[in-house]
Amino acid sequence: HTGRYGREFKVSLTDIMKRILKEVPQLYRLRISSIEVTELDDDFITFMKEEPRIARHLHIPLQSGCDSVLQRMHRPYTTQEYYEKIEKIREEIPDVSISCDLIVGFPQETEKEFEETYAFLQKCRFSFLHVFPYSLRNGTVAADMPCQIDPQIKKQRAQKCIALSGKLYDTYQTQWIGKEADVIVEQCKEEGSKGHSSQYFPVTIA
């Protein structure tokens, strides 16, 4: 839980980020790899909005877009709470890119529940998805649940969401046609220089 870092010392992630950027002024960009939606407080959002060196990308695990599945997963939020949070972030930081983790085929996930998730993914307008078919882990509560999903069904659901991720990515990329992006160059080759934008999409400079 990245967002909980420092709590045992009574400091917040935002406090730590501020200190890093203050003590390392030459640091050009700071990106948070992944953070839970419940850990994105107003202080974090405001700091990200006001500090241009914070990458305009947030990877916020969702896991499921269906409330009944989230309850079985013991996730501490609802789809409505998740949606309201990412919309608040977009309102404050219009050029932000938001991606998520998704697990399909969690035990007892019905076709209707999966379709709810699929519709929610479209509603959220993510820039891309990290999709994982549920994998049984011995010793976990989920492993002992009845109605484990057939591997072929899990594969089909994962493929459908991966295809959606491609469409979402293309849509997001299209929004940047004709616009300037702030890119950190990571490789220089004959075919062009390559790097990532602040929104964490790859860029080739020919």
Identify the residue ranges that each predicted region occupies.
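Conserved SAM/AdoMet-binding glycine-rich loop
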Residues: 1-111, 122
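Thr-Gly-centered strand-to-loop micro-motif
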Residues: 35, 72, 129, 205-206
